[in-house]
């Protein structure tokens, strides 16, 4: 199945960028960041933020379907040898108590938001060339109008791969893919009302939060909640390997991205609450879908902290050495595509990043609110 026209736009822009004088510096930065190889490396991007159109009023916060996470202090970040460079150093963090959704936002809940507001998600809109130009070298020519189509990224299992550091081998831009049509225009979410909503950009998640009177969790809040009251645990359930004992989360078993053995009972998304909750009563804090956090992404953020960080909200801006011009936010928790031999994003310390205007088949969110 051939790539959508928007993928051609991506390749077109990359070819232009490769002609710029700073290519050598960008390549050097890329080599320095090899240890950050992740589920998002070489991910096709829309290359343009979507303007906020959420001019609706916020609702009064309801704590139904939420659980109160107690205040506490914990060691944030990795302490073993499994983490990537951006998970170090481990550091002390204090968080105040907050409420958190016990599950990822579902299709049913997101539909209520859409019905109430008429909001159109990023994936349902055509890319904005005027916004796109802001992230490209001055003088970049405009591609043909035919490539500016509403689309989103859908997973396709390839027959073979050359490198697990090149996610473009299994992600394709699909015209008409969005939260209502997760695999494209011929798919739907009928009977999947209790599944996590996907193809959600950071902008979309923020719009939903505004409508519900809630917010996205900070990265520190997310990790504290994911640990479920445990200390120095690798996973939300403790330290037992994910493929030992009973299935604990919706992840990928087998050879990623070619063959999933479905040992956990699922080939792609699972309904929320399909697996046991962690110590705080939170479901799917590992696997199923990546979850947006409010923080900008910088690989060196932890290294710049000192002492005990009190309710940290992340860096003031974004910087990803692999894509310096693309603003990115943090995503946490891993997805149904995470595998022990690949990103292992279901570890509680694992950090990933995605451009704010990008929606994918494995990305959703959950909300938090203050007391």
Question: Language model features by range: what are they?
Answer:
Residues 1-4:
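Positively charged n-region of N-terminal signal peptides that target proteins for export
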Residues 7-14:
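Sec-dependent N-terminal signal peptides
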Residues 17-18:
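C-terminal motif of bacterial Sec signal peptides marking the signal peptidase cleavage site
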Residues 23-37, 42-46, 68-69, 75, ...:
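Functional-site microenvironments in short loops/helix caps that host divalent-cation chemistry
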Residues 38, 58-67:
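GGW-centered surface loops in extracellular recognition modules
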Residues 98, 113-122, 212:
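Short capping motifs at secondary-structure boundaries
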Residues 102, 107-114, 201-207, 223:
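Short, solvent-exposed alpha-helical surface patches in non-cytosolic proteins
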Residues 361-371:
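Short, structured beta-strand segments at or near domain termini in extracellular proteins/domains
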């Amino acid at each position: 199945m051939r790539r959508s026209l928007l993928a051609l736009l991506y390749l077109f822009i990359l070819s232009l960028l490769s002609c710029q004088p700073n290519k050598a510096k960008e390549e050097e930065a890329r080599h320095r960041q090899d240890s950050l190889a992740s589920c998002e490396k070489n991910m096709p991007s829309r290359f343009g933020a979507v303007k906020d159109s959420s001019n609706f009023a916020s609702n009064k916060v309801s704590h139904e379907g939420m659980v109160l996470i107690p205040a506490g202090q914990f060691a944030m970040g990795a302490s073993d040898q499994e983490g990537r460079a951006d998970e170090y150093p481990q550091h002390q963090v204090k968080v105040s108590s907050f409420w958190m959704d016990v599950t990822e936002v579902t299709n049913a809940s997101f539909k209520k938001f859409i019905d109430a507001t008429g909001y159109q998600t990023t994936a349902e809109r055509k890319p904005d060339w005027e916004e796109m130009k802001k992230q490209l070298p001055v003088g970049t020519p405009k591609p043909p109008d035919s490539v500016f189509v509403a689309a989103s990224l859908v997973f396709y299992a390839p027959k073979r791969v050359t490198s697990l550091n090149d996610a473009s081998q299994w992600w394709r831009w699909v015209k008409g893919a969005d939260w209502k049509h997760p695999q494209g225009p011929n798919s739907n979410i009928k009977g999947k009302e209790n599944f996590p909503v996907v193809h959600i950009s950071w902008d979309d998640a923020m719009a939903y939060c505004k409508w519900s009177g809630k917010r996205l969790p900070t990265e520190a809040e997310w990790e504290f909640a994911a640990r479920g009251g445990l200390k120095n645990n690798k996973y939300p359930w403790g330290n037992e390997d994910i493929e030992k004992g009973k299935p604990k989360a919706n992840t990928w078993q087998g050879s990623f991205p070619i063959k999933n053995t479905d040992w956990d009972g699922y080939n792609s998304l699972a309904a929320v609450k399909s697996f046991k909750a962690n110590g705080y009563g939170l479901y799917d804090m590992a696997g199923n879908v990546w979850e947006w956090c409010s923080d900008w992404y910088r690989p060196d953020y932890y290294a710049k902290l000192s002492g005990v960080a009190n309710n940290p909200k992340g860096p003031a801006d974004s910087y990803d050495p692999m894509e310096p011009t693309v603003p990115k936010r943090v995503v946490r928790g891993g997805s149904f595509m995470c595998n022990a031999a690949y990103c292992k994003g279901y570890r509680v310390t694992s950090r990933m990043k995605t451009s704010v205007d990008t929606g994918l088949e494995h990305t959703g969110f959950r909300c938090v609110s203050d007391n």
